[in-house]
Regions:
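Acidic, mature catalytic/reactive cores of soluble proteins
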Residues: 1-139
Length: 139
């Protein structure tokens, strides 16, 4: 049969590798953070004359630092409340947006749904997901 690798934005929908095969679509903070750092370092070397199209197909070109800033902004936005108090990282759990005791709580999930930003996996993954603090500090 045909072998394919499909894009899966959240939890794995396959039993490959025992069901733990969700490394090909979701947002993983350690990888995203390393990409931001790499783009910043390459910008330091190549400077403002080296640009990339962002987003692809848009015709808009930015420096590598600009690309790093955009990725950082997207990552930090996962934790920012909208006008109604909902944060993408909390998905559809209204309690975190409306309940006074919960509305300021941030859960540092293991990984995030690439299309919606909803936190997936362990909700107490304060280790690598806490890298968002470094991104906030840099901005």
């Amino acid at each position: 049969g045909d072998l394919t690798v499909r894009y899966v934005p959240g939890e794995s929908d396959s039993l490959m590798f025992g069901g733990n095969s969700n490394w090909r679509g979701p947002v993983w903070f350690p990888i995203a953070y390393l990409i931001v750092e790499a783009l910043e370092r390459y910008h330091h070397f190549y400077g403002k004359d080296f640009t990339v199209e962002l987003p692809t197909g848009s015709g808009r070109h930015v420096t590598l630092q600009g690309a790093a800033n955009e990725i950082s902004r997207r990552l930090t936005r996962l934790f920012e409340p909208d006008a109604t108090g909902h944060r993408p990282c909390h998905g559809s759990y209204d309690r975190y947006a409306s309940h006074p005791a919960w509305k300021d709580l941030l859960l540092f999930h293991e990984f995030f749904h690439a299309d919606t930003g909803r936190g997936c996996g362990a909700s107490h993954q304060t280790g690598w997901t806490a890298l968002v603090a470094r991104l906030v500090r840099k901005s």
